[in-house]
Amino acid sequence: MRFALELLAIVVFFVVYKLDGIYSATAALIIMVLLNVFYHWFKHRHVPSMMWITLILVMLFGGATLIFHDPLFIKWKPSILQWVLASGFLASHLIGKRVLVARMLDNQISMPSLHWRRLNAAWVLFLLFSGALNLYVAYTFSEEIWVSFKLFGLMGLTILFLIGQAFYMSRHGSEVRVEERKEGMIEAEETVENRPE
């Protein structure tokens, strides 16, 4: 549901751009992201940190586009977001016992640490590349082409990358069974209960 709402925001941006230009599209994007955050809060009483980051960047760069009447700000937003995410994946690669992608998915898939680290590194490279590619398109081609690339290009690349990730995980990982999850939770509870005071 969350992915569908995020995709809807991009689609609305694209449609409004075709109807009334970049500034109306930017305003529509800000509204859609705000609505997504409000919806998630009222439904779950919690907003993931990724949604907060997206909201802050959209407000900053979208707001700057509207205030200064310069579309270059909103064109930078996807790249900044990708590079912020890349920094998070990279930091987890250097600090801590588990990389970020393992923390996100190891309750569903069991894989050796080496493969989690490779997958995490792949995310870093992909996010850095897609951020750079966004700026290349923004500065090299027309605004209309960039808007189309934002919807079809970046989204298409992300879907292809996720397919590749799923293929890699299917080769090197195994699905975590419900019984194993329950056993892990029971063991954790017993450890807490039996710890010395």
Swiss-Prot record:
NCBIfam families: ispZ, PRK00259.1-3. It is a multi-pass membrane protein. This is Inner membrane-spanning protein YciB. Belongs to the YciB family. PANTHER family: INNER MEMBRANE-SPANNING PROTEIN YCIB (PTHR36917:SF1), INTRACELLULAR SEPTATION PROTEIN A-RELATED (PTHR36917). One of its GO terms (cellular component) is plasma membrane. Keywords: Cell inner membrane, Cell membrane, Membrane, Transmembrane, Transmembrane helix. It comes from Magnetococcus marinus (strain ATCC BAA-1437 / JCM 17883 / MC-1). It is found in: Cell inner membrane. The chain crosses the membrane at residues 22-42, 48-68, 76-96, 121-141, 144-164.
